[in-house]
Amino acid sequence: MPSISTNIILAFITALLGMLIFRSHLMSSLLCLEGMMLSMFILSTLTILSLHFTTSFMMPILLLVFAACEAAVGLALLVTVSNTYGLDYIQNLNLLQC
């Protein structure tokens, strides 16, 4: 396994561990989730380019679209929780009702 792929996989694992360790605040969870998506994007792009998968060139772009949607929904939840309760704890998400 090349060192670049190893570093990207380690970045994904680090972001996953950050997601598991710092799960009390919504902002830190969103940052770790963005780190995971960024490392998945880079790894999928490098894999497609190195293996010459011509039919899969749109997969990293699709992954970026889902990452942008996830970020928008996450920031909307962060603003809603912050305006309602003044804190960004994840446990406050259980109190939100439509």
UniProtKB/Swiss-Prot annotation:
S-S bonds: none
GO process terms (BP): ATP synthesis coupled electron transport
Any one Gene Ontology cellular component term annotated for this protein: mitochondrial inner membrane
Subcellular locations according to the entry: Mitochondrion inner membrane
Topological category with respect to the lipid bilayer: Multi-pass membrane protein
InterPro entries referenced in this protein's UniProt entry, alphabetically: NADH_UbQ_OxRdtase_chain4L/K (IPR001133), NUOK/Mnh_C1-like (IPR039428)
The enzyme's E.C. designation: 7.1.1.2
Reaction(s) catalysed by this chain's protein: a ubiquinone + NADH + 5 H(+)(in) = a ubiquinol + NAD(+) + 4 H(+)(out)
Keywords per UniProt: Electron transport, Membrane, Mitochondrion, Mitochondrion inner membrane, NAD, Respiratory chain, Translocase, Transmembrane, Transmembrane helix, Transport, Ubiquinone
Presence of the UniProt keyword Cell membrane in the record: no
Membrane-crossing segments per the record: 2-22, 29-49, 61-81
One GO MF term attached to the UniProt entry: NADH dehydrogenase (ubiquinone) activity
Domain of life (superkingdom): Eukaryota
Sequence similarity: Belongs to the complex I subunit 4L family.
Quaternary structure, from the entry: Core subunit of respiratory chain NADH dehydrogenase (Complex I) which is composed of 45 different subunits.
Protein function: Core subunit of the mitochondrial membrane respiratory chain NADH dehydrogenase (Complex I) which catalyzes electron transfer from NADH through the respiratory chain, using ubiquinone as an electron acceptor. Part of the enzyme membrane arm which is embedded in the lipid bilayer and involved in proton translocation.
Protein name: NADH-ubiquinone oxidoreductase chain 4L
Organism, scientific name: Prolemur simus (Greater bamboo lemur)
Organism lineage string: Eukaryota, Metazoa, Chordata, Craniata, Vertebrata
